[in-house]
Amino acid sequence: MSDRVLLCGAWDEGAGYPRTRSLRQGLEAAGIEVSECRVPGLGQKKQQILRQPWRWPLAWWRQKSHRETLLQSLEAKVAEVRPHAVLVPYPGHGLVRTIKERVAAPVAFDMFLSAYDTVVEDRKIVRPGSLIANHLQWMDTKACSAADLVVLDTPENAAYVQSLTGLPADRFAWLPVHDPDAAPHVEPWQAPGDGVLQLLFFGTGVPLHGLKTLIAAVAQVDTVHLTLVGGAEDERRFAKQVLGERVTVGPTFVDNARLRELLDASHLVAGVFGESNKTQRVVPFKLVHALAAGRPVITADTPAVARWLDGSGVVFTAEAADSGDLAARLRELSGNLDQLATSASMARGVYNRHFGTQQLAERWREVLLRLNPIRFSGGNQAVTA
């Protein structure tokens, strides 16, 4: 009889929301039968609501009705599937406890992002110690305490949330970021015919990204052209102002097919350069996405990146929030195209070794063994993705 995991929650699907699809792919590659019990998440509305705290009560009330719909179908789904474990995907803060009360199987919560970290420390929407900040910390703690196991994306983030909540360290685990849309093959890296390095940035422009640091660095290096997809409106204006013809400002969002075209046309992909503590703890999805596409990356020098990629030869680093150091690295790379070509040739192999589907499957086996050791103790055989 196969091992079964039920995904239950209100997560987002589609372009821009790879996390839950990644986790499902990893489970399936580990030989797990996966079922779902889901209502739609908030999607891109989350970004607007985060910036407008006065909308939080109404958003909570609307989500409450979705939660009731979800719970109405959960009992029947559990009876049908009889899961050996339940995963509550991100965002699931408001669902973990209620789901846990309604299922007999152990429950894992893919926290992915701390509410406190996102709103207080990274985006600085409210001050530490304020009523809202304290409430967000309480939300994080309540959600984590309800789950049998809490999953983050890096060991550094797992340690951060453990410290924030004060819960035992053995309640936390990590599953790496992974590209669920990685193509089976990559386009060969082509050296620039005009000597101009094509640098690609894509992202929402949250403080973690440090986009203005990147723009200021590119302004100092005449041999770099920036293609900018996303970013906040003031950052897009700033890029046009200081870079002129050396920037192509694209849409605020592109689908996966267009993003792949942009990756194929790039020589180097920009990661994150922000000054918040969160920068030190993440391996950004854009880094993983770029490596999967066979493109080298430049990003902030952080413990999280160094843990996996120090010495890999495919990721180049600069000091976080330091446009001067970043400019020096860009200048060096634009003058050493052979090094970039070599890095590009190795990038997909590095992705496969550290972030590929089989690596995620192996991590899942370890996590499931912790979650339900009696059921999953025999599930460590090799499985082909």
Residue ranges and their predicted role:
Residues 188, 335-369:
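A charged, aromatic-enriched C-terminal amphipathic alpha-helix characteristic of glycosyltransferases
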Residues 190-209, 215-221, 226-227:
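Conserved donor-binding/catalytic core segment of Leloir-type glycosyltransferases
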